[in-house]
């Protein structure tokens, strides 16, 4: 993966004031003077993307003024948008726009246009929009400089103050927040060739945006985006609805310049360094940190085309690992942060317990395809090391539009998504308690998972009526059993697994009662390393 990751973007946004700056009073914001513009719609954007795809790719990035290009991170983060300059849609619209300045790692300018009543007006760069802090320039910056990206603010957590709702900065990344949430993982418009061992991933990027903030009665903001890369172009529409669980309705039409086998739809990017299920980096490297866990997401949640639910805890592998999941006509998937207990993280500033889950629901049937989960080894929590995307089975052919849509929901609790019991903890340990007669031996390991929610708690007083249904792709299950766990109002399932040295096995476990599934299926891979 590129060194220019979402984690870099996250750090940059935080340093520029997003997520840590005080909320802005709506009374402080002003609207620019109306000016005439050309009519523009999503259909016009589709035509524009098609025309660009038919022409040779232009990857040229005009150089920044020397003084701006030389800014280090500390100097660049001194440049902050002036909140009182926030652009409002029509008079009284609850949505306001703030832009990010070019410089440091952000060298490719994007164009921004404001849509009002279907008319497009360019939103032009001006030094008056920014407070430059300690950053000084010998010469005035050019008036056609452009922007690195933008964010939209809305009274999300308080009726009189605005908070950041959604941001677009770097490549094709975007992020959205619901009420009481703090930025963690990111979404992308599209991925290309992610996970290739030759590190030949392509990063599509936004060239231009059109933003419609509506009027005083608007319940959403619409963002049109033109995507481009060496292999393809894309016309994207993001309808962003601020809520307790904010929603982004994504509509996309992609045009490829050549047949593309490696397109990833609705990709997500996150970080998992250490959790209760995977502490090997700490254990083997004597990692010295007060925080017990560090992750933006702790698992992959899937609802299959048949309606079955499964949960795959994330890991920080020793080497890059790619996992595939059959996902034909998939109903939903996402990277989730299930662990909401502060004392599991102990990080007052970063608040991992408030990081959102992003849940993806396709609009219509996507057909045959698979989910691709990529987990990269990381030595700390600053690197994004988890990528997830849905890949169609058939290559995307040039010469015709490839269209799809989906809903992205930013939520804190995923229990409402499924009535089944959920996995709330995953642990592993040597087989047999200290001093017991149980024998493990080489190539054996014990795995424990706590199930709670749904009807699981009903069986606390009669755990014997519940069956552990377990299978492995390699090796054998030596034993399995259930223990009531009142601490989670649920049941702990335990399996002891044995495999040959230096091999791996895929494990699946769910609970069954009266012949019916009681829980989602726990899915996990164990490598005997």
Model-identified regions with their sequence ranges:
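Boundary at the C-terminal end of the N-terminal hydrophobic targeting segment
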Residues: 25-27
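Extended, loop-rich substrate-binding clefts of extracytoplasmic carbohydrate-active enzymes
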Residues: 186-243, 363, 367-375, 379, ...
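A contiguous, surface-exposed recognition patch within enzymatic or periplasmic domains that forms
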Residues: 74, 167-169, 181, 261-403, ...
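N-terminal secretory signal peptides and thylakoid transit peptides that target proteins
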Residues: 1-16
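Acidic, contiguous internal or C-terminal segments within carbohydrate-active enzymes
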Residues: 225-274
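Solvent-exposed N-terminal domain segments of exported/luminal and surface proteins
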Residues: 56-196
């Amino acid at each position: 993966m590129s060194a220019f990751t979402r984690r870099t973007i996250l750090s940059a946004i935080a340093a520029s004031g997003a997520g840590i700056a005080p909320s802005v009073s709506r009374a402080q914001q002003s609207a620019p003077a109306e000016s005439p513009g050309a009519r523009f719609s999503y259909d016009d954007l589709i035509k524009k993307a098609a025309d660009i795809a038919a022409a040779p790719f232009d990857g040229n990035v005009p150089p920044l003024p020397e003084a701006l290009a030389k800014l280090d991170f500390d100097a660049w983060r001194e440049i902050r948008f002036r909140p009182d300059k926030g652009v409002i849609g029509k008079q009284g619209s609850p949505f306001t726009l703030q832009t990010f300045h070019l410089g440091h790692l952000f060298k490719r300018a994007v164009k921004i246009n404001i849509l009002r009543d279907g008319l497009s007006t360019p939103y032009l760069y001006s030094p008056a929009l920014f407070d430059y802090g300690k950053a000084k320039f010998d010469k005035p910056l050019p008036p056609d400089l452009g922007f690195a990206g933008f964010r939209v603010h809305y009274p999300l957590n308080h009726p009189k103050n605005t908070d950041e709702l959604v941001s677009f900065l770097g490549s094709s990344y975007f992020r959205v927040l619901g009420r009481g949430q703090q930025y963690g993982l990111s979404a992308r418009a599209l991925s290309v060739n992610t996970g290739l061992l030759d590190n030949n991933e392509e990063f599509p990027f936004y060239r231009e945006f059109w933003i419609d903030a509506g009027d005083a009665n608007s319940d959403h903001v619409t963002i049109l985006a033109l995507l481009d890369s060496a292999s393809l172009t894309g016309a994207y529409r993001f309808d962003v609805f601020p809520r307790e669980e904010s929603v982004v309705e994504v509509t996309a039409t992609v045009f490829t310049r050549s047949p593309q086998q490696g397109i990833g739809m609705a990709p997500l990017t996150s970080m998992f360094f250490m959790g209760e299920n995977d502490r090997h980096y700490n254990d083997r490297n004597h990692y010295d940190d007060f925080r017990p866990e560090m992750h933006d997401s702790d698992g992959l949640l899937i609802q299959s085309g048949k309606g079955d639910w499964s949960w795959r805890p994330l890991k920080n592998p020793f080497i890059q690992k790619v996992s595939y999941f059959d996902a034909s006509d998939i109903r939903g998937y996402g990277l989730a942060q299930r662990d909401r207990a502060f004392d599991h993280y102990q990080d007052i500033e970063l608040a991992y317990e408030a990081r959102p889950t992003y849940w993806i629901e396709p609009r219509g049937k996507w057909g045959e395809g698979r989910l691709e989960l990529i987990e990269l080894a990381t030595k700390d929590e600053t690197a994004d090391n988890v990528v997830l995307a849905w890949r169609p089975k058939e290559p995307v052919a040039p010469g015709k539009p490839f269209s799809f849509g989906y809903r992205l929901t930013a939520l804190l609790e995923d229990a409402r998504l499924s009535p089944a019991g959920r996995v709330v903890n995953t642990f592993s340990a040597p087989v047999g308690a200290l001093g017991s007669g149980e024998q493990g031996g080489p190539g054996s390991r014990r795995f424990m998972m706590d199930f709670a929610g749904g009807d699981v708690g009903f069986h606390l007083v009669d755990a014997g009526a519940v069956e552990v249904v377990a299978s492995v792709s390699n090796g054998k299950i030596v034993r399995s059993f259930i223990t009531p766990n009142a601490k989670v109002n649920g049941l702990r399932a335990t399996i002891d697994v044995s495999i040959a040295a230096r091999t791996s096995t895929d494990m699946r476990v769910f609970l069954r009662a009266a012949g019916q599934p009681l829980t989602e299926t726990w899915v996990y891979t164990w490598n005997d390393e």
